[in-house]
Amino acid sequence: LHARLNWDGNVPSVIAGSHMDTVPGAGHLDGALGVVCALEALRVLKESGVALQRPLEAVSFSDEEGRFGGLFGSQSVAGLVTPEYLHAACDLDGISLTEAMAQQGLDAREALHAQRNPDSIHAYVELHIEQGPVLDRKGLSIGVVDAITGLFKWEIRLSGAANHAGTTPMDMRADAFQGLAEFAGQIDRVLAEYGSPHSTATIGRVELKPGAANVIPGEAVFSLDVRDTDSQTLEILADAFRRTLSAIARRRDLMFEFSVLSDIAPVQCDTSVVSAVDAAVNTLQLPATHLNSGAAHDAQIIAGIAPTGMIFVPSKEGRSHSAAEWTAWDDIEAGANTLIYTLRQLAA
């Protein structure tokens, strides 16, 4: 969804936006804050009568959080969606992206023609909650983002042999859960040996089959989410986790396979946009710091076609993807004003 101000299609736009979707059980600010503040920024600048040399746009991207893999809207705009992706994209219930869109009267194939001409975008700015504890703990209102993390997300399947829990000796088992447990216990070691201070790895979803209390799990299916702000570090970590899985599978008489759900490169924010955010912060005399984003955002996709930057506001106690997600109204006001001043400078 787009809103446009002073747009005639001839001059590259300055765009602000984010996404409206979020994860199950989440709060009300993730993504939505950036969309609402983008609309408010356009309203304020229009009503103030400020003379701008460039048009402004507000955008709301779809499926950033990833029912079908994540960042679908921004990847469509960036020209990264392929027919193969549309064919393969499914949610955890096996419902395909194509099917879900058809149920709403939409044609997923239209995403193949949604690419924005890079020459039509002067800059993109995204206001977002930090989703981490740094700003809140430091008592700061604004985070100026220097880099956005990259990530790879796998679905891993360890296959052994389901068997009776009481009659199968411990040394004669091919227990898929024991393989998963050993792998989980190796995460800290892998990060310490091959990662950086910015590296994270998370197992966020686990399914054991057949799932009975008196049956040895014959299959363990789980997710692995690994992040860092450096592409080479991510490649090294991917290799280290593959080797760790292979060694555990051999030792425990298991088979393993994995599929790549997401593979997103880290990006550095554009220095001209970062400078515009810095100037806005200085003008408003707001307490701020520079930091990296540990979460993926639409901004890192749009960075492939346009100069991009991000503005963070604090998350109370660092909580996000939770009903406890909260940002103080004073900080929201500071973020909205920083966005307004940033857009004004970029469009001047």
Where are these predicted regions, by residue range?
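A non-catalytic alpha/beta surface segment that caps or lines the substrate-entry region
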Residues: L1-N6
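Alpha-helical metal-binding/catalytic segments enriched in His/Glu/Asp
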Residues: A16-H19, G25-E65, F152-L158, H164-V190, ...
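Zn-dependent metallopeptidase/amidohydrolase metal-coordination segment
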Residues: G17-S18, P287-T338
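Acidic, glycine-rich active-site loops and adjacent beta-strand->loop/helix elements
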Residues: M20-V23, L56-R67, Q131, A162, ...
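Flexible, glycine/charged-enriched surface loops at secondary-structure junctions
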Residues: A51-L52, A111-Q115, T167, R189-I203, ...
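Midchain, well-structured core segments that form catalytic/ion-binding scaffolds
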Residues: D63-S231
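Short beta-alpha connecting loops at secondary-structure transitions
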Residues: P83-Y85, R227-S231, L261-D263, G318-D330
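A short beta-alpha structural unit
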Residues: T202-G211, S223-T229, M255-V274, Q300
